[in-house]
């Protein structure tokens, strides 16, 4: 049904970021040896990804409120794709760290915007049901990605992990084009602003609870 298709597409989009983390973990020792980097520098490639995927979600929410859901989703996936290709071609650890930060910013679109789409489409029990289906698809990534990563590394080396992740980004772009409808109306967009979002964030930060 259309309902299940939407849950599958949104779940896969949400899983792209975690997929890029979990599939990458088995590659850390090989990356250190290949690029002549110490353990701390290699672990930094993971830290900056977590940092940027968190920061990015704060940005994509209000931006998608103002311009619609699909444009920032396309932009984020395209950024993720380009950064993944850059990671696959990186020749030193500093470049890889920088590109992992950019990759996380792109992946944040897949984490934040599908949840906003669910809220646009449904409320109450229907929203909870769609979100639970989305999370079910999302939860498969931490189980399968490390196994897939280990297999890819054994066959083709650590750089191949990023090529596989880049292919996932292409599939995400295609799924967005074919399977995701714009759910934010022009009238709703007019009611949104970055200033309003910033004010809401400040209110949350001031809340002692």
Predicted regions and their residues:
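Residue-level signature of mid-helix packing/kink "hotspots" within the transmembrane helices
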Residues: 22, 50-58, 142-143
